[in-house]
């Protein structure tokens, strides 16, 4: 039987209604998914995520830089969007709200940009020529998006150019050097935001001086081998943007 992901998602909703709202403990997810050609829950989950992400009507906007203020109108309007920046003309340090050493960033020529949330990490340094991606997408009421959905796609793409590519938590390493960091965050009950910083500029000394030494060695992608525009275009393909 040919798989029908749209039907499968509708059938999962019927299953959840029966199990949760009607308190029917005999409800079996496979009885529902089999009607749409699925007998493997992992395959269904992967296809469902792909469908939810790629069936949205995104706008693509090039920005001089990326920060929470530029993305906010799309987030508040619940309008799916891919914002990106390559040629920003300045150096930026993206920091959690609690970061309090703006003078150190300024000393090395970086303009501080608050991320709008807190985490345990220090500044994320970004230079003219790096690729910054900010995706706004609508959440589904019961289908969760894997935190590493885009990491896995990017890793597989990079393996076309490099033999040694790994995912390490929220980072991607090439030849054991960190070239990329990315996160998926809940903005509201209805909106997810995906943020990526992909390094094409050598910032090794600045990262060591500002962030201190880390177990992960800072690295970057050689733009003679692979440029930022090409990776940006891959994100557009992954979102099925025409």
Task: Show the residue positions of the predicted features.
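Active-site loop/lid in soluble adenylation, ligation, and acyl-transfer enzymes
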Residues: 2-18, 25, 45, 49-125, ...
């Amino acid at each position: 039987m040919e798989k029908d992901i749209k039907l499968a998602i509708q059938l999962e909703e019927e299953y959840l209604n029966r199990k949760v709202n009607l308190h029917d403990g005999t409800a079996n997810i496979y009885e529902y998914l089999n009607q749409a050609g699925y007998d493997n829950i992992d395959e269904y989950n992967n296809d469902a995520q792909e469908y939810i992400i790629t069936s949205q009507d995104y706008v693509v906007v090039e920005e001089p830089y990326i920060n929470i203020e530029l993305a906010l109108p799309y987030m508040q309007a619940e309008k799916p969007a891919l914002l990106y920046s390559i040629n920003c003309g300045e150096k930026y340090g993206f920091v959690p709200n609690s970061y309090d050493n703006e003078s150190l960033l300024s000393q090395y020529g970086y303009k501080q940009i608050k991320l709008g949330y807190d985490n345990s990490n220090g500044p994320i340094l970004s230079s003219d020529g790096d690729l910054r991606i900010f995706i706004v997408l609508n959440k589904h009421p019961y289908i969760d998006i894997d935190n590493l959905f885009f990491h896995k796609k990017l890793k597989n793409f990079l393996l076309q150019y490099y033999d040694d590519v790994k995912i390490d938590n929220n980072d991607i390493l090439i030849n054991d050097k960190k070239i990329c960091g990315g996160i998926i965050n809940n903005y509201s009950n209805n909106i997810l935001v995906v943020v990526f910083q992909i390094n094409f500029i050598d910032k090794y000394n600045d990262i060591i001086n500002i962030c201190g030494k880390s177990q992960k060695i800072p690295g970057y992608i050689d733009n003679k081998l692979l440029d930022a525009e090409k990776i940006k275009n891959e994100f557009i393909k992954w979102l099925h943007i025409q």
